[in-house]
Swiss-Prot record:
May act as a toxin. The keyword Transferase does not apply. This is Orphan peptide CllNtx. This toxin is only found in male specimens. Coiled coil: none annotated. Disulfide bonds: none annotated. One of its GO terms (cellular component) is extracellular region. It is found in: Secreted. Its main location: secreted. Expressed by the venom gland. GO terms for molecular function: toxin activity.
Amino acid sequence: KYCYNDDDCKSECMVVKYCQQGTCYCKGN
């Protein structure tokens, strides 16, 4: 799933979520 901003990653992560170059990254799940 392509993301445009950090809000697009909210459903994918539990704790820290951010969008970088179209990809959602999670930390501390």
